Amino acid sequence: MEDSGVNPMDSPSKGSDFGVYGIIGGGIVALLVPVLLSVVLNGTKKGKKRGVPIKVGGEEGYTMRHARAPELVDVPWEGAATMPALFEQSCKKYSKDRLLGTREFIDKEFITASDGRKFEKLHLGEYKWQSYGEVFERVCNFASGLVNVGHNVDDRVAIFSDTRAEWFIAFQGCFRQSITVVTIYASLGEEALIYSLNETRVSTLICDSKQLKKLSAIQSSLKTVKNIIYIEEDGVDVASSDVNSMGDITVSSISEVEKLGQKNAVQPILPSKNGVAVIMFTSGSTGLPKGVMITHGNLVATAAGVMKVVPKLDKNDTYIAYLPLAHVFELEAEIVVFTSGSAIGYGSAMTLTDTSNKVKKGTKGDVSALKPTIMTAVPAILDRVREGVLKKVEEKGGMAKTLFDFAYKRRLAAVDGSWFGAWGLEKMLWDALVFKKIRAVLGGHIRFMLVGGAPLSPDSQRFINICMGSPIGQGYGLTETCAGATFSEWDDPAVGRVGPPLPCGYVKLVSWEEGGYRISDKPMPRGEIVVGGNSVTAGYFNNQEKTDEVYKVDEKGTRWFYTGDIGRFHPDGCLEVIDRKKDIVKLQHGEYVSLGKVEAALGSSNYVDNIMVHADPINSYCVALVVPSRGALEKWAEEAGVKHSEFAELCEKGEAVKEVQQSLTKAGKAAKLEKFELPAKIKLLSEPWTPESGLVTAALKIKREQIKSKFKDELSKLYA
C-alpha cells in the first residue's frame, strides 16, 4: 500500500478540534498565569519584611533596622568617606558625562496686572551642560581662588544664594580646602541673616548678585565678613553703588575668583570623616534658626543609605534641581545624583512648569525643556500639581471628565490590587488615552519621585502615582539626621507611611507616657521617634545645652537624636508618623487635639491653599486660619453670584466663609475626625504664606509661632 504521507491522527476534523481546544487552553493559561502570579506577588509584598527588630543600646524602646542591612552602611564604596573624596572619584569615573546644566537666558519682561502689581516673566532657552571633568576643574579653580583672595582655611564660608550650578561648585570647592560651609536660605530676613553670619563668624560670603543690595544695607552689622563673592546672573545688573557701599569688605565676582585660582593653583587640604562639612541653619518654626553641624561622614553615609533603596540611577538619568540647596533634603539628593553619575539640571519653583508664575507665555518651563527622569518634591508642591490637574479636568467637563474619572478609578483599583491593571494591560491603555498628557506637566519622563520635608497625604500620593505613572519614595528625616531616617521603597504600594529605616541607621520608638503612646500598644508599638546611627549629626553650633537635651550617645557609642515626633511601626517594619509632641493640645473638657493631624485632613479640601488650626486649653473648641485657593474660591463666587472687586473683599464675605467651612467639615468627616477636632470658626486670609513672609519654611511647612504672633488679633476675635 502506497504511503499517502498523511498521518491518521492529522484528520481535518481532529486537527480543527485540537486547534480550538489549544486556543481555549492557551487563553485560560494566559489568564490564569497573571492571576496566580499576582496572588503570589501580592502575598509576597504584603508579607515582605522591610524592617526588622534589633537590640541596641541606650534608652529602652522598640528598634528597627533595614531588613537588607545587618550592618550599617557608611560609604557608597571604599575610599569615599568624605565629600571631596567622593566627588573627585565620581568626576574621574564619569569625566566625559553630563553633570551640571543651566538654561540659557534669552530675555525678560514685566507685565502689569489689573490691580497694578508688576510681574517678571522670563524667556529661557535650552539647557547648556558642563561635564563631570569640566565641573571638577572649576571646583579646583574656585578652591585655589578662595585662598588667593585671602580666605583663611580655618574660617567659614557662607552661601546665601538660590539653587544653581555655582552654588554646587562653590560648595565642593570649599571642601577641597577643608573649609566649613554655612548654608543660608536665600529667602531669609535681615535679622536672621545677620544672626546666622555673626553667630558662625563667617569670613567669606557667597551670594547671588541680586542679594548685593540687601547686603549693602546691613554690611555695618556684619562683624566678621571680609569678602563677598557674588554670582553673576544673566539679566541682573550689578549696581556700582551696591559694591562701593560695602565699606572694608572686598567684593569679587565668582568668575574672577575662578580665574585667579586657575592662574595660581593651591594644593588641596582634605578633611577628615569627622570634620564638620556644613553648618546648616534649620528653617524651624520657633525663634531664631539653630545651626546644625553636619560632618562629612554624615553626608556620605546618608547618600550611601539612599542609594541602597532608590531604583538604580546611572548616567542616563536626569534630575531636576529646584528646591533650596540650603535644605538638607535637596543637598542630599544632589549628592546621591552625582555619586550615581547622573546629570543635574537646575531650575526654580517659579519657572518649573509651562504655567509657572515667571514663565513667559508660549515658552517652556524647566521640566518641559529638561524632561527629567528623577525629581524631588515637597508635599505642598505635589498638592498644587494635583489641584491644577483637577481644575483643568473640571474646566473641560463633559466626556473628558467622565473618561478621566473612569480611568482614574480603574487605575486606583489596579494599584490597590487588581491583577489585570497591575500587569500593565489597562495601564498601557489609560496611559495612552488619558494620563500621557498629564505626565507632560512634569516633562513626561519621570520614573521615580522622592518626597520629603513634610507628610504627603495618601490622596495626593495615590494621585501622583496614577497620573504621573511613577512610584514615590516618601522619606522621613530632619536636618539633625542629615535627612536620613527612613525611606519608602519603590515597590511598596502602601500610602501614609514613610518606609523602613535607611541602611545607614536605626529608628527606635520610646514610650511617651504623658501622651499615651507606648511601645506596648497593640496592634502596633507607638512612641517618640528616635533616630540613631551614621546619619545623626554632631549637634547644634554654639548651643551645648540644646544639644545635650536632644542628642544622646549610648554605651555602645551609637549617637541618637530625639525628634519630638510620634510614630508607630507597621508589622512589615515600616514607620508611620502619626503626631508631634508639641502639636498636641488639651482642650478645656479634656479632649486632646493633634493640630498637625487635623491640618493634614482639612488640607485635602479644594479650597485650602494653606491652613493653621489653633487650639486653646481654656476653650472647648478649636479654630482655623485659612489661606484659600484663589482660583477655587473665585470660581465658586462666580457660579454662586457672589460679587466682589478684590480677592480680599471676597475673603471677608460671610457666604465665602460658610462655603469654605462646609468644605472643611466635609473633609474632616471623610478623615473620621471627631467633632471637637473640627474648627468651630475660621478666618479667611487673602495673602499667601511664603518663605519670604516668614510664615512657612523653605519646605513650605507652616511656622506656627510666627503665624500665631502675626494674626493674634484675628485668633482672639475667633474666640470672642
UniProtKB/Swiss-Prot annotation:
Cysteines engaged in disulfide bonds, as pairs: none
UniProt keyword annotation of Phosphoprotein present: no
Organism this protein belongs to: Arabidopsis thaliana
The enzyme's E.C. designation: 6.2.1.3
Renumbered residue ranges of the record's region Fatty acid-binding: 554-582
Pathway given in the UniProt record: Lipid metabolism; fatty acid metabolism
Top-rank EC class of the record's enzyme: ligase
UniProt-recorded Gene Ontology molecular function terms: ATP binding; long-chain fatty acid-CoA ligase activity
Family under the similarity heading: Belongs to the ATP-dependent AMP-binding enzyme family.
Residue positions, PTM N-acetylmethionine: 1
Swiss-Prot/TrEMBL GO biological process terms: fatty acid metabolic process
Top-level lineage group: Eukaryota
Catalytic activity entry: a long-chain fatty acid + ATP + CoA = a long-chain fatty acyl-CoA + AMP + diphosphate
Record GO cellular component, one term: Golgi apparatus
A UniProt-annotated Pfam family: AMP-binding
Sorted UniProt keywords: Acetylation, ATP-binding, Fatty acid metabolism, Ligase, Lipid metabolism, Magnesium, Nucleotide-binding
Described function: Activation of long-chain fatty acids for both synthesis of cellular lipids, and degradation via beta-oxidation. Preferentially uses palmitate, palmitoleate, oleate and linoleate.
Protein name from the UniProt record: Long chain acyl-CoA synthetase 8
Binding site for ATP: 279-290
Cofactor(s) demanded: Mg(2+)
